[in-house]
């Protein structure tokens, strides 16, 4: 491991036990359209992990629900989802041994690259007292994981 200078983590299911949290939040947000459509959005989320909520809600509104259906629009879905997820991320389990792994990798930069909302991730990790571990930064949507990684590599923040 002596040649490794950075470790890049995903958030959901890696650092935080939060995969089910987001599935439940997507379901809850879509429930005003009915259980059938809420289940369809939750299933779409599961099948398309790592894609931003912006894209998932746009897909839901444009491709899943029928034209003229009554229910919350894009901004309301986004706001409800953000509130629900943030509340649950503040309470979910943190990966066991994270602190001891950080201690064993002192000389390496830690980064988070996630499909989650970047501002929300920074706020949650700050409020949970975990932000200091990620000295390389905490990155998320609206940019995709691929775009974030390309930028970090091109700016020599991650060396391969």
Labelled PLM ranges:
Residues 6, 145-160:
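Conserved Lys-Pro-Asp/Glu-containing loop-to-beta segment of HAD-superfamily phosphomonoesterases
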